[in-house]
């Protein structure tokens, strides 16, 4: 099994679990993260309440949150790539694009490649993982957590291969 295959298995497991999105989340266990710490991490009380509502709705629907971790988009990608010894350090979506990917065309992406959003390649603000069949896994936001989304090429500005940079 390749490192790319291991990465895809791990990121899909997190998406299946629907882990929460928290600004600055880098894989901290939810059950070990005090609620005041989440409030400190979030940019506003409104965003903090959105996170709380997401967690509450998942629990009220019967989700087992004991193994959940908190993520933001770059925290999710860098955590997994660091665990698999693909990259050496944590960074932003922009940093992932600049330092840890071989830039490729959005037309030639394959499962495990990363896709990026932003105003342009010098102002990247979001990263997700392409998993094939026009689907991505992303730490989408406070109302959605880590989830599967449809890949719509026109919504993304760049792509990169983190396994061959």
Where are the regions a protein language model picked out?
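N-terminal capping segments
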Residues: 1-84, 137-139, 163-164
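...with weaker cross-activation on analogous glycine-rich loops/strands in unrelated enzymes
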Residues: 2-8, 78, 85-153, 162-165
